[in-house]
């Protein structure tokens, strides 16, 4: 599986952004919108955006695969956030139009406690051995997904630590117009970040599964490359999102040669998301578990067992996958 950049922090927008004082269509109760101007940002230009690989921005929750307890483990995103007093000081500092990077944090006292197994995200800056909060006052990080942790039950549904495998959605290796759901060794995903999508994630924009039979999958970041993207102009991108079948996606993430990731979200361009007919649901999908040695070893209710029952079947679209339970 070809590796592109991994998502270890918030990605900047490809365009310079401006704040508009009107209710956000992305976040409820947010009284402002962050919109893209027509100017390509310095960060994007410095990262050589014109030579970058554009990929689909998938709407889910970010995950990471790295070692825990001497084996590959799935980790869930958990950002450390300031306690109430520190958050109040930080907000007052921002209201005075100061640069958030100049705010002084006492990491040991200003932040809510993290689980013992929490680790900071890879690219987090450190001073004197302490992670430095980002411009939002958060410290990005990860916690391992334990099998019986109810808080991360949807994460744990897509991994099996006994057989060290994960349920992954990607292009079929021999047909780029066909999607494939397969059981992938966790060792093949080490040090990669992925997006968890499904029934109980972010309002389920792709319409997967049902309340009775939830369905969740992992998608490696950068898995869906965009082949025919227009020029990097505001109006051309708006037209592409609105008029092209391939544009029925949440946004674009450019993977730059220096490892930098740059994005644009439909909301940056004043466009709606979620939308009724996504590009992800316009392509057929095949189930290819390839798990003979494990056939009888799965819990009867687990996702791996459900997918084994429909192994080698082809569906017109992801939405059509229904388990006969």
Curated annotation (Swiss-Prot):
Effect of residue 250 to Q: Abolishes RNA ligation activity, in vitro
Taxonomy of the source species: Eukaryota, Metazoa, Chordata, Craniata, Vertebrata
Processing and modification events after translation: AMPylates itself (auto-AMPylation).
Record keywords, A-Z: ATP-binding, Ligase, Nucleotide-binding, RNA repair
An example Gene Ontology molecular-function term: ATP binding
Domain of life of the native organism: Eukaryota
GO biological process terms on file: hematopoietic progenitor cell differentiation; response to reactive oxygen species; RNA repair
Protein name: RNA ligase 1
Role: Functions as an RNA ligase, in vitro. The ligation reaction entails three nucleotidyl transfer steps. In the first step, the RNA ligase reacts with ATP in the absence of nucleic acid to form a covalent ligase-AMP intermediate and release pyrophosphate. In step 2, the ligase-AMP binds to the nucleic acid and transfers the adenylate to the 5'-PO4 terminus to form an adenylylated intermediate. In step 3, the RNA ligase directs the attack of the 3'-OH on the 5'-phosphoanhydride linkage, resulting in a repaired 3'-5' phosphodiester and release of AMP.
EC number of the protein: 6.5.1.3
Pfam families in the cross-refs: RLIG1 (PF17720)
Organism: Homo sapiens
Effect of residue 55 to A: Abolishes RNA ligation activity, in vitro
């Amino acid at each position: 599986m070809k590796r592109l950049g991994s998502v270890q922090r918030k990605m900047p927008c490809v365009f310079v952004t401006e704040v508009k004082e009107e209710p956000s269509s992305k976040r409820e109760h947010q009284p402002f919108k962050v919109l893209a101007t027509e100017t390509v940002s310095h960060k994007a230009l410095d990262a050589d955006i014109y030579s970058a690989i554009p990929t689909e921005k998938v709407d889910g929750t970010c995950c990471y695969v790295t070692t825990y307890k001497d084996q590959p483990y799935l980790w869930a995103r958990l950002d450390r956030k300031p306690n109430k007093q520190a958050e109040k000081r930080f907000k007052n500092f921002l209201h005075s139009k100061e640069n958030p990077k100049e705010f002084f944090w006492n990491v040991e006292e200003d932040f809510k406690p993290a689980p013992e197994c929490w680790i900071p995200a890879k690219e987090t800056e450190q001073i004197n051995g302490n992670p430095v909060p980002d411009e939002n006052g958060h410290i990005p990080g990860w916690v391992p997904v334990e099998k019986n942790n109810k808080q991360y039950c949807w994460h744990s549904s897509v991994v099996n630590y006994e057989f060290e495998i994960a349920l992954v959605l990607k292009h079929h290796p021999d047909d780029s117009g066909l999607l494939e759901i397969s059981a992938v060794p966790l060792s093949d995903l080490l040090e990669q970040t992925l997006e968890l999508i499904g029934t109980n994630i972010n309002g389920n924009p792709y319409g997967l599964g049902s309340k009775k039979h939830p369905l969740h999958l992992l998608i490696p970041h950068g898995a869906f490359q965009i082949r025919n993207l227009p020029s990097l102009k505001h109006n051309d991108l708006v037209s592409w999102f609105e008029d092209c079948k391939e544009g029925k996606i949440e946004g674009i993430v450019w993977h730059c040669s220096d490892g930098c990731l740059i994005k644009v979200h439909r909301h940056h361009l004043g466009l709606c998301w979620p939308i009724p007919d996504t590009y992800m649901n316009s392509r057929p999908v095949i189930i290819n578990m390839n798990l003979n040695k494990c056939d009888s070893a799965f819990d009867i209710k687990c996702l791996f067992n459900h997918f084994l029952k429909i192994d080698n079947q082809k569906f017109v679209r992801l939405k059509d996958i229904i388990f006969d339970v």
